From Swiss-Prot:
BP terms from Gene Ontology: translation
Keyword Repressor recorded: no
Complex formation: Part of the 50S ribosomal subunit. Forms a cluster with proteins L14 and L24e.
SUPFAM superfamilies for the chain: Translation proteins
PROSITE patterns for this protein: RIBOSOMAL_L3
Cellular component GO terms, alphabetical: cytosolic large ribosomal subunit
Underlying gene: rpl3
Organism in which the protein naturally occurs: Thermococcus sibiricus (strain DSM 12597 / MM 739)
Similarity comment text for this entry: Belongs to the universal ribosomal protein uL3 family.
Lineage: Archaea, Methanobacteriati, Methanobacteriota, Thermococci, Thermococcales
Annotated region described as Disordered, given as residue ranges: 336-359
InterPro entries found in the cross-reference section: L3_arc_euk, Ribosomal_L3_dom_3_arc_sf, Ribosomal_uL3, Ribosomal_uL3_arc, Ribosomal_uL3_CS, Transl_B-barrel_sf
Pfam families hit by this protein: Ribosomal_L3 (PF00297)
Protein name: Large ribosomal subunit protein uL3
Amino acid sequence: MGRISRPRRGSLAYSPRKRAKSIVPRIRKWPQEQEVRMLGFAGYKAGMTHVLMIDDAPGLTKGKEIFVPVTIVEAPPLMVYGIRAYKRGYFGLETATEVIVPDFKLENYPSKRAKNVTFYKLLERRIKTLPKNYTEEVFQQKLGELEDLVKTGEVVELRALVATQPWLARIKKKPEVMEYAVGGTSIEEKFNYIKEKLGKEIRVGEILQEGELLDIVAVTKGKGTQGPVKRWGVKLTSHKDSKGRRKVATIGPWHPARVMWTVPRAGQMGFHHRTEFNKRLLRIGENGKLTLNGEKIEITPNGGFPHYGVVKNDFIMIAGTIPGAIKRIIRMRPAVRPPAKRPPAEAPQITYISRESKQ
């Protein structure tokens, strides 16, 4: 006789399945590293292709050529525009103070018609409370006050405030702003690292390394309102069932006299905040090009990536799929819980990259 019980359909781990608060994903946990570097980067999802590579992981195919799907994320340089200090509060970390750089002219703005475009002019599209009459003298004064707080030991954590530059990828004008933790053993070396980077661009090759494992944080592709069959995976009812088949046969007992939250119901599907762990970074490219077998090749396939176009900036190649729609902001950090049998830290040997049209 077969079993009369089974696991429930659909996981309750992510309930309530509602839309993310922001399209810019948040990162709450950071790896503990002794190397002084910014713990992560951000880019825009361009599309997918596939490569042939020599498998270097333990297994039956080690040393053989295997087929691997890859995702291309365009990663224009990030602008480090500020530093935020945290102190120990009653309920955890609290913001002690923050210092941002004064306004400056953007030399790399791609438009020929827009002259004298400043960083604040684009940043104020995202932050409405930028300071007025903020001079270099005021900036140096605030930076000195923050350095005094660091020396006294009142500051327990420092984060780098960065802004993306989507105009370099011809995606949009409004930047995304976010903060990143910095690795290191002391608060002083973290402060010196961010202080040196203030007002400067930081490239993905300075932060990430080929072959390392990353955690990908993004907002998934939205599907709108969907029924319980697609949203939760419940089985269709019998063909003799009345009033439809793509429904839940019973939504609960008479008492308690309400529908419980565990019952699979129709509602929002997709546009959820998700983190995927331990994605391998295969390659880092510069200016849309990659070195393969001793020659530079463009990563953009024939006809461009669908719904994206041509990759012209730095980019990263990640093994497998990642959440998010095309052109969506993708954040990444070094893996916080790498597997015990992790692949080699070096980049694998790639023998072929597909540049066939994806149209």
